[in-house]
Amino acid sequence: MEFPIVNIGREHVDRFVNEIAPLVCNEYIKRMTHGEHVIYPSTCIAQAALESGWNVNAKTLFGIKGDGFVSDTTEYIDGTYINIQDSFKCYPNVATAIQGFYDLMQNERYRAATKAVDWVEECKEMYNCGYATDPNYSDKIINITETNNLTVFNDYCLAILRGEVSAEETDNSGRVEELADKLENGDYGNGRDTRAERAAQDGYTLEEYEAAQLIVNERS
């Protein structure tokens, strides 16, 4: 059973999902194995897409409030959408942003969401728990999930946890970091096409190459 690849036909969507999905699934499986409170991968990915505008390079992938940087945002207050400035946490890379999201889910505030019976109820509870003020928030992340077939990642992770497929097939974070180091060191040259081709010759997938290139960009 191969790791799912989303191919919706919209380049920015496909790239976003396929770059962060392996990292989200790794974190989900790890947290489930340790008995922690979790949110389905599909919901995590959908929230990241909505909060960042499908921008994997966004300073705040999940729109988590906290010390970091100040940015314009829209909040729904007293029945009205209001543009304000607020402070958001900033993470050094996608992997740590995902870890930060799942760390946040350990808060008792989100217990109704992490105990939801399915991903649809989970999306509804994310709004009820106060993750966002937009009354349409749940509908938006449900729509993103359904439109882009994100539940395939839930199925894959649950298959691993049931022992139906080896976790080694999705635990590629070490390979991605290794490839990022090689790219940064110039082991595969400077041309993008050349680097991708040489990485493929060494057995790396295109998804691993794209994820590694993202890490390199974040380091610079």
Sequence positions of predicted segments:
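Repeat-associated, polar segments at repeat-unit boundaries in modular proteins
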Residues: 152-155, 200-220
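Catalytic cores of secreted/periplasmic lytic hydrolases that degrade extracellular macromolecules
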Residues: 1-170
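Extracellular glycan-binding segments that recognize GlcNAc-based cell-wall polysaccharides
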Residues: 126, 174-178, 214-220
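Surface-exposed aromatic
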Residues: 120-127, 181, 191, 197
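Acidic, Ser/Thr/Pro/Gly-enriched interdomain connector segments
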Residues: 7, 167-174, 178-179, 185
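A general structural motif at alpha-helix termini
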Residues: 48, 130, 145, 199-202, ...
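Extracytoplasmic Gram-positive cell-surface binding/anchoring modules and repeats
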Residues: 173-175, 184-196, 204-206
